A protein has these predicted regions:
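Conserved core of the PLP fold type I
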Residues: 1-98, 108-128
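Conserved core segment of the aminotransferase class I/II
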Residues: 125-193
Length: 193
C-alpha cells in the first residue's frame, strides 16, 4: 500500500542527519524506514485529538525539519483522530514555515458510523498555498485486500518525478494483476471519490 511511498519519500528526501518530526507514538515501520536513511526523528506529542498543534509549531520553528510525518486519521498505534480544526492549523503551519507535511492516510476510508474529518489533501483548498507543501499517501490495502499492496502518492511535481524514478529503479512497476484489481474496484464505485 502506502508503505512503498513512505520508503520512496525517505529515499528521495532524507540525507543523514536531517530532522523529521513524527507523532509520538507513530507507525513503527515508518520509524525504521526514516532511520534507515539517517533521519533524526523528533517526537511531537499527541492527545485524543491527534498531534498537539501548538507543540508541533514550536518544534517546527526550533528544528526546521525536512518534513513532518502525520497519520491524521486513526493514527497508528494511538488511534487518535486529528480534529478538523487541527488539520487546518497543520496546513497553515506548512505554509507559514514552508515545511512539507507527509500525510499517511491508509485508514481514511476504514470507519464505522460518523465519517472522520476530510484528509489534509481534501482540506488543502481551504488554506491557500498549502497544496505545494503537502504529500499525501494512500492505500487500498486496508479496505480491499492487505496482500494487494497498491497505494498512491500525491506530491509536488519535482518530488513525484524523483519518487517515480526511484520506483522504476526498484521494481519497474507494481504487479499488473494488482493494478487491474484495484482499477476494477475503483471503477465499480465502491470507494468514495
Amino acid at each position: 500500500g502506502s508503505q512503498q511511498g513512505l520508503d520512496l519519500i525517505g529515499k528521495t528526501m532524507i540525507s543523514p542527519g536531517d530532522k523529521v518530526i513524527v507523532e509520538g507514538p507513530t507507525f513503527l515501520a515508518t520509524i525504521q524506514c526514516f532511520r534507515l536513511y539517517g533521519a533524526e526523528l523528533i517526537s511531537a506529542p499527541v492527545d485524543g485529538q491527534g498531534v498537539k498543534t501548538d507543540e508541533l509549531e514550536k518544534l517546527i520553528a526550533e528544528h526546521k525539519p525536512k518534513f513532518v510525518y502525520l497519520i491524521p486519521t486513526f493514527g497508528n498505534p494511538s488511534g487518535a483522530l486529528l480534529s478538523a480544526e487541527r488539520r487546518k492549523q497543520v496546513l497553515q503551519m506548512a505554509v507559514k514555515h514552508q515545511t512539507l507535511v507527509v500525510e499517511d492516510d491508509p485508514y481514511g476510508d476504514l470507519y464505522f458510523g460518523e465519517a472522520p474529518p476530510p484528509s489534509l489533501l481534501a482540506m488543502s483548498p481551504e488554506v491557500p498555498g498549502s497544496r505545494e507543501w503537502l504529500i499525501h499517501c494512500g492505500s487500498l490495502s486496508k479496505v480491499l485486500s492487505p496482500g494487494l499492496r497498491v497505494g498512491w502518492m500525491i506530491a509536488p511535481p519535482e518530488l513525484l518525478a524523483r519518487a517515480t524514478m526511484c520506483k522504476q529503479f526498484s521494481d519497474a512497476h507494481t504487479s499488473t494483476f494488482a493494478q487491474a484489481t484495484a482499477a476494477h474496484y475503483l471503477k465499480a464505485g465502491r470507494m468514495p471519490a
